[in-house]
């Protein structure tokens, strides 16, 4: 059985139209993973073997001058000098709405991550991560795809200036889940499930670095996810505690929400 679930993720309540037919273009000659692996040049080695040897880029999809990056995530943190994705990592934890400054050593902020899983519900990033191969990964400025091997899920995404479209194809006859969490290292944030509007909404408060380190910056990263398929189960979680049937949760380490979808014998979108 193969089932396809599509999600529309909206930032700041701005909608986007469906993507159309993909045509051959020069975009597919651009590999956005460039800079995510450590440099082996003599000059790079002179500066050290930590973050200095990386380009601190990320394989993001977005429109030119877009407000948000959309990137696969292999690092579960918004910590300073830690990019969301590194080529050497072996597991993908989800797909992040990121504000990472490419080429810098600052921090990500106001971000959120969503991840499809199947079979047993695994919701924490360190538990739900799936093995993947770079040979089964496509990374261009307009389109990203990868096979999540642990779940036999083919994940695709494309970005607009303030929104993204995801398509997840579940290839196994197992329970199909979607996990969503705000990425707050400070244990702050909020998330709620609206089964009437078929939405997951939330925010991740931004915190300062350098002057006033750790203090609230006075604004949040807000997100809205719209889903199309009917759900059979929903709930929230906080770290290792699961709350089936609960619609909202706020503040705490490792908070998030999950949905379990109805899967039919025929393909659904």
Question: What do these predicted regions represent?
Answer:
Residues 1-4:
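Positively charged n-region of N-terminal signal peptides that target proteins for export
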